[in-house]
Amino acid sequence: MNLSFAAIDFETATGYMESACAVGIVTVTDGEITDEYYSLIQPPENEYWRANILVHGITPEMTESLPGFHAIYPE
């Protein structure tokens, strides 16, 4: 099977797309997982909506000392 792709998943801290608080990436080559990446990210001003926390379980305390998206993007 020649199935190759990358799947990307973002979790957000608020209802705004620029509030990423986590990113996960999986690369599949010829139907096999060949690479995985996951990182928590500090969203702007470390602001979270309670409804979003209930969905993914990520809290402000978990990201308060982490870099923002622009710092991890080169990875």
Indicate residue ranges for each PLM-predicted region.
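Conserved non-catalytic scaffold segment of RNase H-like nuclease domains
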Residues: 1-75
